[in-house]
Amino acid sequence: MSHYLLAIDQGTTSSRAIVFSAQGLPVASCQQEFKQYFPKDGWVEHDGEEIWLTTLQVCRDALARKGLRAADIAAIGITNQRETTLVWDAASGDLIHPAIVWQDRRTADYCAELKAAGHEANVSARTGLLIDPYFSATKLRWILDNVPGARQRAERGELRFGTVDCFLLWRLTGGRSHRTDATNASRTLLFNIHSQDWDEELLALFEIPRSLLPEVLDCAAEFGVSEPSLLGAAIPVLGMAGDQQAALIGQACFQPGMVKSTYGTGCFMIQNTGEQPVTSKNRLLTTVGYRLDGKVSYAVEGSIFVAGAAVQWLRDGIKLIDHAHESEALAIQAGDSNGVYLVPAFTGLGAPYWDPKARGAIFGLTRDTGIKEIVTAGLQSVCYQTRDLLEAMRQDGTPPSALRVDGGMVVNNWMMQFLTDILGVTVERPEVTETTALGVAYMAGLKAGFYRDLDDIASHWHLQRRFAAHMAEERRGELYAGWQNAVRRVRSEA
C-alpha cells in the first residue's frame, strides 16, 4: 500500500521535494538552488529548463534518501512560486522564452498606461487584484509581443501558457495535462474570481488568445498522472495550490479571520475571509484562498517583494555575511540597529504601496555604523513591512489577534521576537514550518482519501513556540515612525 505523499515545492530560488507521512510529518526531503537572471534593471528571469530539471532531480533524490519507490507514493501535490510566466510549444514542450518571474517589473510602463486609461477599477472588480507588473497577464502579453512570431503562433493554437505549477504538470504528464488550480489562476489578472472562469473581457483587454490558457480545477482534484519513466512508476497528481495559499492550508487557517505570514524570498500575509470576497480599502488583494468541491474560500493578501531576499543581498550582493544564519547572531550582538533603516525596494514596493519604481536605500548611517547594524536593519525591514500589512488589515476592520508564521526565516528567534514586538500581536510558530509543501500534501492526501475533511487536517497542526510582545508601546511607535519616514523617502513620487 502507498503510505506517503510527495510534495513538490518549486520556489523562487530553489526547487524542493518533501515526502510526508499520512500524519503530516516530513520523512525525507531534498532541495536544489538554481540561478536567477537579471538581464536589465528591474528584469528578473529563470531558465524554465533549470526549474524542470531541478524539480525532477529533487523528487528522485527525496525518494532515494528514504529508500522509497514510486509505488510507495499515493499522490503528488504541486505548489509553486505564483505569477511567474512561461510559454511553450504545444507540440514539443519547448519554452519560447525564459520564465518571467513575479518580481520582474518590465511591464511597469504598460501597467501605468492601463491605469491612466481608467481600467484598474474594472480589472480589480473582476480579479480582486490591482494592475501591476507582479501579475501574469502583462508578462504574457510582453512575451507574445516581443518574441518573433509568438502572437501569430498563439492565435493558431500552437502555444501554451502556464504558471510554474501548470508547466511542471505538463512536463510530469508528458504533455498530456494542461491544467492549473483556482489559486494559481486567481493570480494571473485574467481570472474572474466570482465566476471562477477565465474572463473574456480581460482576455480582450490584455490581448490574450484563450487557446493559450489551461483548464482550471479545484485544489484537490485529478490533475493527471506522471510519466512512469520519470520516477519509476505512474503517480497521480492530486493536489495543487500557489505557494501562499498552500501555506494557508498548511497552517490550518480554515476559519474566517485566521491569518498566516510566510517568510521566504518575499513575505506574504493572507487572511481567510470565508465564502464571500472582501474588498480592501487599503490596497490589499482579494484572492482565492482555496477551492474544494467547487466551493471557494476567499482571502485578502498583502505581498512584500523582498524578505529573505534582503538577507541574500546582504550575503551575495554586498557580502557582509557568508551565510544567512549568521544574521541572527549579529542581530543579537547589535541588540538594535541604532537608528539604521534598510528599505529593500530592490524591485519596487508591494502592498500596501504598489510602487514599482521605488528603489532601495539605507538611512541613518553614522561613523559608528557597522556590519551588525546593517544586518539587523535588514532583518527589521521584514518585520516593519509586515506591520505595514497588519495596519492595512486593521484599517479594513479585520484585525488579527495572532499571526501564524512559516517559511525559512522563522527559525530566527531574534527576528520572531522583534516581529511580535513591532506588531504588538502574538506570533505562533508551528512544529512543521515547511507549511507550503505540507499544505499541498494535505490537498493531495484529501483527494487520495488520507483525510476526511478540513477538520481532520486541522487536527494535525501543532504549536512549537508562541512569541509574546514585550516592547513598550511608545518604543514600538517610535521605531515604526522611523520606518514610515524611510519609506516615504524612497517612494517614486517622493
From Swiss-Prot:
GO terms for cellular component: cytosol. Keywords: ATP-binding, Glycerol metabolism, Kinase, Nucleotide-binding, Transferase. ATP binds at residues 12-14, 265, 308, 312, 408. Its EC number is 2.7.1.30. It is an enzyme of class 2 (transferase). Sn-glycerol 3-phosphate binds at residues 12, 82-83, 134, 243. It comes from the Bacteria. GO terms for molecular function: ATP binding; glycerol kinase activity. SUPFAM superfamilies: Actin-like ATPase domain. Signal peptide: none annotated. It holds the Pfam family FGGY_N. This is Glycerol kinase 1. It comes from Pseudomonas aeruginosa (strain ATCC 15692 / DSM 22644 / CIP 104116 / JCM 14847 / LMG 12228 / 1C / PRS 101 / PAO1). The lineage of its organism: Bacteria, Pseudomonadati, Pseudomonadota, Gammaproteobacteria, Pseudomonadales.
